[in-house]
Amino acid sequence: MGQKINPLGFRLGTTQGHHSLWFSQPKNYSESLQEDQKIRNFIKNYVQKNMITSSGVTGIARIDIQKGIDLIKVIIFMGFPKLLIENRPRATEELQMTLQKELNCVNRKLNIAITRIAKPYGNPKILAEFIAGQLKNRVSFRKAMKKAIELAEKADTKGIQVQIAGRIDGKEIARVEWIREGRVPRQTIRAKIDYCSYPVRTIYGVLGIKIWIFLDEA
């Protein structure tokens, strides 16, 4: 039997890097980890509330956190930062202030920067959000998958695989459906593969979306 491993963890140190960069004493490690989770959840909720979009795509690809002794630097990689900033020109400062209060970090400065991704639909997280929005609007899963692949192809990807599992179209028996376009060498460590696993709540229950995108070979 093939042992399934997370493609990002499998390539850590070769084509993938860490999303959190900090050192901590063993006794404080769990606290720092919880703080990271709190920061990420807070930012996602804030962006969801303040984005001017009907599709439900927040467009956050990833959130990098770097911690020093007296500074927490947060970099938000977004596909569509305009949708957030157009609505609120001071969105970054506002987010920074509210997050600082939430974390209650008195002796540490918080710095938030938003970086735009050149090709948003070349990112699996943004594509998964797009598919989730389509499924919530009761669009046929095959149509949603094909549209996602079209968008990914426009972003110059070398290959993509999309998988949806669960009670698809409200059927009584759960099943797995997948579609692949191009090359996706999941066993090759030097292959730069981006991956995302994303749960979506529909009226029939929870569906799981998985996306593998083959970007390049190192």
UniProtKB/Swiss-Prot annotation:
Alphabetical list of InterPro entries matching this protein: KH_dom-like_a/b, KH_sf_prok-type, Ribosomal_S3_C_sf, Ribosomal_uS3_bac-typ, Ribosomal_uS3_C, Ribosomal_uS3_CS
Main location: plastid
Key words, A-Z: Chloroplast, Plastid, Ribonucleoprotein, Ribosomal protein, RNA-binding, rRNA-binding
PROSITE patterns xrefs: RIBOSOMAL_S3
Pfam families: Ribosomal_S3_C
Keyword hit for Chloroplast: yes
Localization per record: Plastid, Chloroplast
GO biological process: translation
Self-association and partners: Part of the 30S ribosomal subunit.
Name of the protein in its database record: Small ribosomal subunit protein uS3c
Organism for this UniProt entry: Ipomoea purpurea
Phylogenetic classification of the source organism: Eukaryota, Viridiplantae, Streptophyta, Embryophyta, Tracheophyta
Encoding gene (name): rps3
